[in-house]
């Protein structure tokens, strides 16, 4: 039953006489004849009813805000196009170093799983060559070039570089806002380095890498996304053509060949490009205050999940069927936890 206020909005007047309205959205009774309400009245009624539902209200508010951001996306896209033009015409020329540089990045903002893939490459390469990792050190409070050491705090080195260093103590890890300055410093101080991984550097075109790797998530592939701030893309979709390798990350464990082919057809890779599909394999959880107590994934008790990452859906989907109760405390990406927290 439509609220009275909505019914009144659908009523019009003919020569001073009020029409009578039905309580539904479908038709309006006018002088005994049934007529469809005007499009504007339908829209008003739909919006009113939708906003009465909390879930629909949130969805509509989100869509409304996004459409308000559309002009900003066009303006942002204009800036991206100028930046691209400067490099395509070689008005700005990228620098190529003598040692191999591998760039790992993405087209969208956060949540694609770059850091685990960087760690995977470090784990593999360190057995064959002297490998180094250079990151901007997102959200750190320090500036300039810094060698990352395990005793540093996250606000000094950035949480992700610190995580990489803690897992691979023998690997050279550094942070610097300028990738050119950072690589130059690393090579000058440690000439034994044979390859450097640039974390999140696809948009930093001042360096010409030996290999450009980009990630896109299975749930939110770049080909169905839009430019910031309307969408999550940092560049136009066709920027993927600069990459040598594309990785579809966070895939389901059982990925059929039919789904693979569907994604490949939509990505439409160039002849020289390689496309891979990856998924995460989580380790067994252990007790926070007693690490010797471990659980197998199918034996989890009630869980309090505390996260400060860009995308939580993949982790939630993994944990929900493996625990009797999941309470999730969500913080923004790279959140600094206080002593109280």
Which residue ranges define each predicted feature?
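Walker A (P-loop) phosphate-binding motif
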Residues: 85-150, 253
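Low-acidity, Ser/Thr- and Arg-rich intrinsically disordered low-complexity segments
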Residues: 3-23, 29-38
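Residue-level signal for inorganic ion chemistry
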Residues: 75, 115, 164, 199, ...
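Conserved beta-strand elements of the Class I
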Residues: 130-134, 214, 302-306
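C-terminal accessory "lid"/substrate-recognition subdomains
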Residues: 55-58, 221-341
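Short, small-residue-biased leader/transition segments that mark boundaries at the very start
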Residues: 41-42
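Phosphate/Mg2+-binding loops and adjacent switch elements
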Residues: 138-269
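A transmembrane-helix-recognition feature enriched in membrane-embedded lipid enzymes
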Residues: 53-100
């Amino acid at each position: 039953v439509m609220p009275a206020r909505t019914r009144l909005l659908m009523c019009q007047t003919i020569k001073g006489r009020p029409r009578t309205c039905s309580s539904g959205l479908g038709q309006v009774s006018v002088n005994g004849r049934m007529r469809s309400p005007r499009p504007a009245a339908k829209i008003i009624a739909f919006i009113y009813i939708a906003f009465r539902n909390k879930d629909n209200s949130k969805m509509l508010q989100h869509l409304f805000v996004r459409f308000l951001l559309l002009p900003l996306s066009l303006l942002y896209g204009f800036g991206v196009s100028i930046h691209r033009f400067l490099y395509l015409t070689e008005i700005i020329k990228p620098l190529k170093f003598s040692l191999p540089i591998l760039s790992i990045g993405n087209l969208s903002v956060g949540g694609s799983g770059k850091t685990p893939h960087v760690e995977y490459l470090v784990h593999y390469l360190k057995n064959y060559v002297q490998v180094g990792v250079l990151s901007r050190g997102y959200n750190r409070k320090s500036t300039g070039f810094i060698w990352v050491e395990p005793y540093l705090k996250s606000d000094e080195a950035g949480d992700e570089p610190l995580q990489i260093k803690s897992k691979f103590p023998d690997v050279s890890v550094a942070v610097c806002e300028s990738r050119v300055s950072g690589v130059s410093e690393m090579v000058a101080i440690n000439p034994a380095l044979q390859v450097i991984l640039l974390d999140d550097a696809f948009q930093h075109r001042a360096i010409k890498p030996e290999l450009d790797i980009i990630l896109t998530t299975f749930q939110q592939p770049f080909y169905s996304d839009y430019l910031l701030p309307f969408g999550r893309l940092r560049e136009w979709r066709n920027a993927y053509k600069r990459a040598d390798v594309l990785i579809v990350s966070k895939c389901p464990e059982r990925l059929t060949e039919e789904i693979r082919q569907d994604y490949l057809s939509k990505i439409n890779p160039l002849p020289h490009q390689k496309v891979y599909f990856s998924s995460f394999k989580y380790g067994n959880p252990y007790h926070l205050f007693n690490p010797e107590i471990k659980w197998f994934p199918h034996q989890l008790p009630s869980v309090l999940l505390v996260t400060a990452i860009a995308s939580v859906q993949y982790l939630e989907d993994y944990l929900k069927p493996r625990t009797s109760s999941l309470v999730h405390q969500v913080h923004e990406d790279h959140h600094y936890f206080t002593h109280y927290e």
